[in-house]
Amino acid sequence: INVEYKKPKMADPLFVNVFASSAGRYEGNAVGAFELNDRLSTALFVNYYNEEQAHDKNGDTFLDMPEMQSFSAMNRWHYQTPRFVSQSGVKILADRRTSGQTAHTLHGNESFSPYTISNDANRIEAFSKNGLILDPNRNESVAFIVSGSYHDQQSNYAEKIYNVYESNVYASLLYESEFGEQHKLAAGLNYNWDNYSQRGNVIERYSPQWRDISENVTGVYAEYTWTPNEKFTLMAGMRGDYSSLHRWFATPRVHIKYDATSWLNLRASAGKGYRTTFVFPENSYLLASSRELYIEEDLKQEEAWNYGISASFHVPVKNEELTVNAEWFYTDFQNQVVADMDRNPHAVYFYNLNGRSTSSVFQIDASYPLFQGFTLLGAYRWMDVKGTYDGKTMRKPLTSRYKALLTASYETPLKKWQFDMTVQFNGGGRMPTPDATNPLWGGTFPSFTQLSAQVTRRFRRWSIYAGGENLTNFKQDNPVISADNPYSRNFDAIMVWGPTMGYKLYAGIRYNIPKL
């Protein structure tokens, strides 16, 4: 899903949404857009939600869901002339979450120190995207993008403390031009700086990953697109980067698109990818257990080849169009940072891949309007994700083998009513290897089904809606291991593979002033 914020020039002058649920969640968001003149416009986005009602339906003294309070806002500006366009903005976030045991779940029985988890995060980021058309006849243009962010996150997992402060600066200079009708060239320069400052008491022995980490990456790239006719497009690119941590590396890629007929589109791609892993910021959820964390060696940059093919069918059926999309993606890791929870049920080991690690994902979806206003969509995704854990090739734990989706949507002829229903099927998978002498969980987890539905009534400028989530009321039984003794070596709250809350009902109101 590709999500983009509304552009100030295109957004409605005012949109407001308020929402409440049976789980005690209250949320409100608003968007206001202002067109100051023909060239300059701005928009303000605000969101706040509060979900601080305690839930402990299974009576294990641990909250089924964190108590949460969050505020975020963004101010976005848009400036445009016939040859120049600029988009800039600032975003802020303040997020507070509390989980574990609280006075509500202990019911006043606080004879021992409660196991409380808290996470406070504050974030600010700014960005600016600027483009200048040099020659409209050749679609020749130059663009400059710059962004920066600061993230402050302070966490407590009972007696464990983990605080991380992240800073990022990114800049990119891009050039594009067409050479005739068949050839297009794009080239550019990139710079990225990441800095992590970490404080706490969560690692068993020293590792370079625990110190303050800073990485500078400078890169250059070129991309050539060949379109000999309306049916065929070939794009090939190469980039080279220099990292202050990993030195030089090159990243090639190629994409092919072929419109075989008016109803069949084919695509194929191949390329290489690299990624620097920051173990603790990316895996802080592991601290919600008594597992000890070990980094066994200096961790290398992750490296993988990626391949993909896809086909889209648009078939006329009884004066309507049946749309079918099928795609397959395969990732083959040359190196990967492995998080091994199988070697020891009381520890997590991080090390470089020594063996094979692959991911094969196949997805197919189809949609068809059965009759006026009624659309049916079905989708199925199969995932085969394997890695080498301590010399053994196994499927990735806590990962479903498949997911399936069936949605039905009906809108009345006058568009006053809309009814939506979604059924989601989640396949089972493998659990981390339990303790053979004292197994506290099974080796696999089962498949499960969830149902959600919503009805909307529209009026001229406002609408009301109501619905429910997880209407099948499926819940994972006792997701917290050894909840009765959270300071024991067996305690583990990360073995979560399904929903921990039952059904939720909700209702809301939307109001908007449309753009004239």
Roles of regions detected by a PLM:
Residues 1-17, 30-31:
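N-terminal periplasmic accessory domains that precede
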Residues 18-22, 48-52, 79-83, 92-96, ...:
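Transmembrane beta-strands of outer-membrane beta-barrel pores
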Residues 141-147, 151-155, 259, 265-267, ...:
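Membrane-embedded beta-barrel scaffold of Gram-negative outer-membrane proteins
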Residues 229-230, 329-332, 352-434, 510-515:
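Gram-negative outer-membrane beta-barrel transporters
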Residues 13, 39-42, 83-86, 135-142, ...:
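Repeated loop/turn-to-beta-strand initiation elements of outer-membrane beta-barrel proteins
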Residues 113-134, 142, 148-235, 353-354, ...:
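Outer-membrane beta-barrel transmembrane domain signature of Gram-negative proteins
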Residues 51-72, 78-142, 148-166:
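Flexible loop and strand-edge segments within Gram-negative outer membrane beta-barrel domains
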